UniProtKB/Swiss-Prot annotation:
GO biological process, one term: inflammatory response
Matches recorded under InterPro entries: DAPIN, DEATH-like_dom_sf, Leu-rich_rpt, LRR_dom_sf, NACHT_NTPase, NLRP_HD2, NLRP_innate_immun_reg, NOD1/2_WH
Cited function: May be involved in inflammation.
Pfam families the record matches: LRR_6, NACHT, NLRC4_HD2, NOD2_WH, PYRIN
Domain of life where this protein originates: Eukaryota
GO cellular component: cytoplasm
Localization per Swiss-Prot or TrEMBL: Cytoplasm
Family indicated by similarity: Belongs to the NLRP family.
Protein name: NACHT, LRR and PYD domains-containing protein 9A
CDD domains found in the cross-reference section: Pyrin_NALPs
Alphabetized UniProt keyword annotations: ATP-binding, Cytoplasm, Immunity, Inflammatory response, Innate immunity, Leucine-rich repeat, Nucleotide-binding, Repeat
Binding site for ATP: 149-156
Amino acid sequence: MMDSSGYGLLQYLQKLSDEEFQRFKEHLRKEPEKFKLKPISWTKIKNTSKEDLVMQLYTHYPGKAWDMVLSLFLQVNREDLSTMAQTERRDKQTKYKEFMKNTFQHIWTMETNTYIPDRSYHEFIEVQYRALQDIFDCESEPVTVVVSGSRGGGKTTFLRKAMLDWASRNLLQNRFQYVFHFSVFSLNNITELSLAELISSTLPESSETVDDILSDPKRILFILDGFDYLKFDLELRTNLCNDWRKKLPIQIVLSSLLQKIMLPECSLLLELGNASLSNIIPLLQYPREIIMSGFSEQTIEIYCVSFFNTQTGVEIFKNLKSIKPLFNLCRCPHLCWMICSTIKWQYERREVASRFGRTLGLLYTIFMVSAFKSTYARNPSKQNRARIRTLCTLAVEGMWKQVYVFDSDDLRRNGISESDKKVWLRMKFLQNQGSNIVFYHSTLQWYFAVLFYFLQYKDTRHPVIGNLAQLLGEIYAHKQNQWFHTRILLFGMATEQVNSLLEPCFGCISSKEVRQEIIRYIKSLSQQECNEKLVVHPQNLFFCILDNQEERFVRQLMDRFEEMTVDISDVDDMSATPYCLHRAPKVKNLHLHIQKRVFLEIHDPEYGDLELFKLGQKCSFTTNFGDGLLFCTFLHLPHLKYMNLYGTNLSNDAVERLCSALKFSTCGVEELLLGKCDISSEACGIIAASLINSEVKHLSLVENPLKNKGVMSLCEMLKDPSCVLESLMLSYCCLTFIACGHLYEALLSNEHLSLLDLGSNFLEDTGVNLLCEALKDPNCTLKELWLPGCYLTSECCEEISAVLTCNTNLKTLKLGNNNIQDTGVKRLCEALCHPNCEMQCLGLDMCDFTSDCCEDLALVLTTCNTLKSLNLDWNAFDHSGLEMLCKALNHKACNLEVLGLDKSLFSEESQTLLQAVEKKNKNLKVLHFPWLKEELEKRGVRLVWNSKN
């Protein structure tokens, strides 16, 4: 039986006579070819009924059925049906638009907080609005647009305005026939749903069927917001589905839509906050971005004038502008409303205006207390506490359950009476949303949820609400969840200043206990084995500390850490980092990564609003960066011994400031890693000069274009008797054999250097021969030489062999990824068997030798008593060759402890042989990439950063 989805098409086929219907089917045999689709078999449609044919059309040609039918009506001379169908469809589309217009006009008028008059709002969003129009006007193909920006910056409001304007025929009329707006967090409690059911839930009566609507998906736009509040994760999936009729877990439906598996021809307009941006972006195909940048200075002035009367508004605007940190907060529309509301309440009570401060915890508390006093100023604190606690319980229960829309049962269950609800609505703590209730802004739900723990610290059993320790676990263990945004408020409210505001109104506040619990948790976090090298994104901890700023508390927290990895991804991160690290006296090892985009934000107007940074004094730190204070902050940490800036682009000026800080007597850094910092040969000279009298013993400059000129400067440093450098890492530095000439002299005069890494440079045999001349000199004390990927051949093995037989200092030699071949390996084996050879670690991985060398290598294993580690990875030898090696490994004279081999590349028989050797020889480990971890650590290379770089 025909379901309702195909009824619209069927009613028109019913108007065809039998003879017309037969001709219709005959033309249908060729019609799909016009759409580049496969035709339905004639045997399936020859005798089919009209009802069955509709089902087949929707099944075989989803999204194209109506286009085909309208074309076929013309071919059977029923232009009247084609015209009638198109007219009726337009009428139904018009009715849908009218329905959406009325719906969103109500939402816009009653439930949307624009904070400014409509005319001014249009000016506020002019740039973003024009960008939205341009994107869809220029692109005929499906487009995915992401609206991003700070919390409370107006993203959701912008999308509601776009929906209202489309329904009012003022936006994208020629592009989209249907636009659907969904807040995805409303799907949190739905287990399974089809996209068809989701769309149907928004349609008024007498609408087109879902099949008809989706018959032209390129004319459909989905507007989706609320991703920050989803209970479930959306991630790259393989179990996606293209059937929009099929009932599926809601996360599969959303992922399939976002990843363009379901309805790939439709367009998407998404609101993504900070909590969801990094998770959702990887799912999208070539997304375009529109950024909501907040209020301009002019908009703030308009807002103040419209919020107060004209003269008062002008005065308040001037006062706000004179307090730069506070004025910068006003750029966020929601915070601007809070600040002005607070001032208005204080004016009405003729109170002295509060000093707002610059922390969010303090700002929200001043706002809440001012609002509360406007109604309950004379009530006893015990009564006030009981009343506000009901609102806090509603908020925190919602957070734990991930519920953001409440009904009357939710309010009653948490003790909120009808009279209290009216007060909360009047205070703008809550607002109506249809027949339900939501917090006036999502951040207010976070605030009252956190306030719950200050009003009721002692554990009370609740089936849903977790205690403070559990809350901290949710914030830091799971990171991106519904608690993501509360972490700053929790720290910001745990201050004596906030305590002094709350206690007169609500009685005793548990600020001290909350601080102690935070310290206990951070202590446990810093001591966990898995966090031995704690990776800190400033937003996760430093911003929280910055919102507290109580010196004793901050130092108690930062005193817990001895090693940190800090990833700085924007200017705000840069402003928070030095404040916190300056209060971390025990940090010994610091991995610091400043993403390239940070410097673009500072210097390039296209990547950031420089005026905004200046107004908010956010640039003070970045300006100080140029004066060297950034490095002073880090390098003057009393216990700091290890500093890693891998991946941070440093200009010559920045390098100069860094080196100036290194020269201070208070700097005790012994390991300095500057890999991939875009350091030039000129900057290398600056570094070399600064290290002559420093305490730096380990220097990594890998992946920098130092060239031969830069190495020449380093060699001058090495020749200075005051230089105490022991390790120098120079892989991927664009060096040639000429650099080896400079190093020759340095190796003969430096007594401290024990490790030299020259991997992946174009040294060739000529360069290595020069190094060998130095190594044969008894004055050369080098212990490790890394030469992987240096374009060596078997020709240089003669000189290397001579070194092995006369130099007893050299213990490690890495020759991997060179074209040494059988001839070279055999020559090296002769030297390794020499009684004077004391080699301990030898790398021959990827050296293009065969099983012909295995007999020679086997002899080395039983002859060279000092050899402990041998890397033979990625070489082509067969089972017979492996047998010879294993026989030697089982020999009592073999002292090898590490053998580099990828066991998975060998046959099952060979793997069994290796396993037997490992079982017999308990001291031996057969490993793939046996030295990779050590090499990356010494070079300071970070493989993965949590960044958008």
